[in-house]
Amino acid sequence: QAVYRDQWNNVTNAYRTGSVNAEFKMPVGKVNDFITVGAQILYDRAGTISFTTTHILPALNYHKSLSSEHNRYLSLGFMGGWVQRRFDPSKVTTNSQYDGGGLGENFLNSQYSYIDGSVGMSYNSNIGADPNNNFYIGGAYHHFNRPKNNFYRNATIELHPKWVFSGGLRMGVTDFAYITVQADHSRQGG
Protein backbone atom coordinates (compact mmCIF):
# COMPACT_ATOMS: atom_id res chain seq x y z
CA GLN A 1 0.00 0.00 0.00
CA ALA A 2 1.30 3.44 -0.90
CA VAL A 3 -0.20 6.78 0.14
CA TYR A 4 0.75 10.36 -0.76
CA ARG A 5 -0.99 13.44 0.59
CA ASP A 6 -0.67 17.22 0.17
CA GLN A 7 -2.40 19.22 2.86
CA TRP A 8 -3.10 22.96 3.04
CA ASN A 9 -1.59 23.84 -0.33
CA ASN A 10 -2.64 27.48 -0.01
CA VAL A 11 -0.15 27.77 2.90
CA THR A 12 3.52 28.30 2.09
CA ASN A 13 5.35 24.98 2.12
CA ALA A 14 2.34 22.85 2.96
CA TYR A 15 2.39 19.40 4.51
CA ARG A 16 3.58 16.63 2.21
CA THR A 17 3.36 13.06 3.43
CA GLY A 18 4.29 9.82 1.71
CA SER A 19 3.95 6.33 3.15
CA VAL A 20 4.65 2.82 1.90
CA ASN A 21 3.48 -0.23 3.85
CA ALA A 22 3.90 -3.90 3.00
CA GLU A 23 3.14 -7.18 4.74
CA PHE A 24 3.79 -10.75 3.60
CA LYS A 25 2.05 -13.82 5.04
CA MET A 26 3.88 -17.15 5.38
CA PRO A 27 2.58 -20.43 6.86
CA VAL A 28 4.58 -21.83 9.75
CA GLY A 29 4.36 -25.12 11.62
CA LYS A 30 1.23 -27.25 11.60
CA VAL A 31 -2.46 -26.41 11.44
CA ASN A 32 -3.20 -22.83 10.34
CA ASP A 33 -0.45 -20.87 12.16
CA PHE A 34 1.37 -18.22 10.18
CA ILE A 35 3.78 -15.32 10.49
CA THR A 36 3.68 -11.98 8.75
CA VAL A 37 6.74 -9.89 7.98
CA GLY A 38 6.33 -6.30 6.95
CA ALA A 39 7.55 -2.73 7.07
CA GLN A 40 6.23 0.80 7.33
CA ILE A 41 8.17 3.64 5.71
CA LEU A 42 6.93 7.20 6.21
CA TYR A 43 8.27 10.57 5.04
CA ASP A 44 6.64 13.81 6.18
CA ARG A 45 7.76 17.38 5.42
CA ALA A 46 6.01 20.51 6.65
CA GLY A 47 6.31 24.25 6.89
CA THR A 48 8.76 26.95 5.98
CA ILE A 49 11.54 25.39 8.07
CA SER A 50 11.14 22.04 6.25
CA PHE A 51 10.39 20.09 9.43
CA THR A 52 10.90 16.51 8.26
CA THR A 53 10.17 13.17 9.89
CA THR A 54 11.30 9.83 8.46
CA HIS A 55 10.28 6.41 9.86
CA ILE A 56 11.65 3.03 8.76
CA LEU A 57 9.91 0.41 10.91
CA PRO A 58 10.07 -3.33 10.14
CA ALA A 59 7.45 -5.58 11.75
CA LEU A 60 7.18 -9.26 12.68
CA ASN A 61 3.91 -10.93 13.78
CA TYR A 62 3.02 -14.47 14.84
CA HIS A 63 -0.59 -15.66 14.48
CA LYS A 64 -1.50 -18.78 16.48
CA SER A 65 -4.58 -20.68 15.30
CA LEU A 66 -6.78 -21.64 18.26
CA SER A 67 -9.22 -23.79 16.28
CA SER A 68 -8.94 -26.06 13.26
CA GLU A 69 -12.67 -25.64 12.56
CA HIS A 70 -13.14 -21.88 13.00
CA ASN A 71 -11.18 -18.75 12.22
CA ARG A 72 -9.79 -18.00 15.73
CA TYR A 73 -6.36 -16.47 16.20
CA LEU A 74 -4.23 -15.08 18.99
CA SER A 75 -1.62 -12.76 17.48
CA LEU A 76 1.54 -11.19 18.87
CA GLY A 77 3.43 -8.53 16.96
CA PHE A 78 6.56 -6.43 17.23
CA MET A 79 7.46 -3.29 15.30
CA GLY A 80 10.58 -1.23 15.74
CA GLY A 81 13.15 0.69 13.84
CA TRP A 82 14.75 4.01 13.02
CA VAL A 83 13.14 7.46 13.23
CA GLN A 84 14.76 10.76 12.23
CA ARG A 85 13.53 14.34 12.68
CA ARG A 86 15.19 17.41 11.19
CA PHE A 87 14.62 21.01 10.14
CA ASP A 88 16.49 23.76 8.28
CA PRO A 89 17.71 26.29 10.89
CA SER A 90 18.56 28.85 8.18
CA LYS A 91 14.82 29.22 7.55
CA VAL A 92 13.84 29.79 11.21
CA THR A 93 12.54 33.25 12.15
CA THR A 94 12.15 34.20 15.82
CA ASN A 95 10.93 37.33 17.61
CA SER A 96 14.54 38.23 18.56
CA GLN A 97 15.36 38.78 14.89
CA TYR A 98 12.66 41.45 14.56
CA ASP A 99 14.31 43.40 17.40
CA GLY A 100 17.68 43.48 15.61
CA GLY A 101 19.05 40.51 17.51
CA GLY A 102 20.21 37.14 16.35
CA LEU A 103 18.24 33.95 16.17
CA GLY A 104 17.83 33.80 19.95
CA GLU A 105 17.76 30.00 19.98
CA ASN A 106 20.67 27.73 20.79
CA PHE A 107 20.09 24.72 18.56
CA LEU A 108 22.97 22.32 19.07
CA ASN A 109 21.51 20.11 16.40
CA SER A 110 19.06 20.56 13.57
CA GLN A 111 18.41 16.81 13.45
CA TYR A 112 18.23 13.80 15.73
CA SER A 113 17.51 10.09 15.35
CA TYR A 114 16.30 7.37 17.66
CA ILE A 115 15.24 3.74 17.74
CA ASP A 116 11.55 3.20 18.53
CA GLY A 117 9.75 0.01 19.50
CA SER A 118 6.18 -1.28 19.89
CA VAL A 119 4.51 -4.54 20.84
CA GLY A 120 0.89 -5.63 20.51
CA MET A 121 -1.46 -8.56 20.97
CA SER A 122 -4.91 -9.29 19.54
CA TYR A 123 -7.58 -11.97 19.45
CA ASN A 124 -9.99 -12.42 16.55
CA SER A 125 -12.70 -14.97 15.92
CA ASN A 126 -15.73 -15.84 13.86
CA ILE A 127 -19.14 -15.41 15.44
CA GLY A 128 -21.26 -18.49 14.86
CA ALA A 129 -21.03 -20.57 11.70
CA ASP A 130 -20.82 -17.68 9.21
CA PRO A 131 -17.12 -16.80 8.64
CA ASN A 132 -18.14 -13.29 7.52
CA ASN A 133 -19.40 -12.48 11.03
CA ASN A 134 -16.39 -11.78 13.23
CA PHE A 135 -14.86 -9.64 15.96
CA TYR A 136 -11.46 -8.63 17.25
CA ILE A 137 -9.99 -7.09 20.40
CA GLY A 138 -6.42 -5.99 20.93
CA GLY A 139 -3.94 -3.85 22.74
CA ALA A 140 -0.58 -2.31 21.91
CA TYR A 141 2.21 -0.63 23.83
CA HIS A 142 4.11 1.93 21.73
CA HIS A 143 7.46 3.62 22.48
CA PHE A 144 8.25 1.07 25.21
CA ASN A 145 11.93 2.02 25.08
CA ARG A 146 11.13 5.72 25.84
CA PRO A 147 13.38 7.24 23.15
CA LYS A 148 14.87 10.69 23.67
CA ASN A 149 12.84 13.19 21.66
CA ASN A 150 14.31 16.69 21.29
CA PHE A 151 16.72 18.89 19.38
CA TYR A 152 18.48 20.17 22.53
CA ARG A 153 19.99 16.82 23.60
CA ASN A 154 18.23 17.10 26.94
CA ALA A 155 18.33 13.57 28.34
CA THR A 156 15.16 14.12 30.39
CA ILE A 157 12.84 14.76 27.43
CA GLU A 158 11.55 11.48 26.07
CA LEU A 159 8.71 10.11 23.97
CA HIS A 160 6.25 8.78 26.53
CA PRO A 161 4.85 5.26 26.07
CA LYS A 162 1.37 5.01 24.59
CA TRP A 163 -1.27 2.36 25.25
CA VAL A 164 -3.78 1.66 22.47
CA PHE A 165 -6.83 -0.59 22.87
CA SER A 166 -8.96 -1.57 19.86
CA GLY A 167 -12.03 -3.61 19.14
CA GLY A 168 -14.31 -4.28 16.24
CA LEU A 169 -17.34 -6.26 15.13
CA ARG A 170 -18.68 -7.14 11.67
CA MET A 171 -22.11 -8.70 11.18
CA GLY A 172 -23.88 -9.54 7.94
CA VAL A 173 -27.25 -7.90 7.38
CA THR A 174 -27.91 -9.36 3.92
CA ASP A 175 -25.82 -11.32 1.42
CA PHE A 176 -24.38 -8.01 0.18
CA ALA A 177 -24.36 -5.72 3.24
CA TYR A 178 -22.56 -5.68 6.58
CA ILE A 179 -22.64 -3.56 9.69
CA THR A 180 -19.16 -2.79 10.97
CA VAL A 181 -18.43 -1.18 14.34
CA GLN A 182 -14.91 -0.28 15.44
CA ALA A 183 -13.52 1.55 18.46
CA ASP A 184 -10.07 2.68 19.59
CA HIS A 185 -8.86 4.21 22.82
CA SER A 186 -5.34 5.50 23.40
CA ARG A 187 -3.53 7.00 26.34
CA GLN A 188 -0.06 8.54 26.33
CA GLY A 189 1.98 10.20 29.05
CA GLY A 190 0.73 10.91 32.57
For the regions a language model picked out, list residue spans one by one.
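Subset of outer-membrane beta-barrel
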Residues: Q1-G190
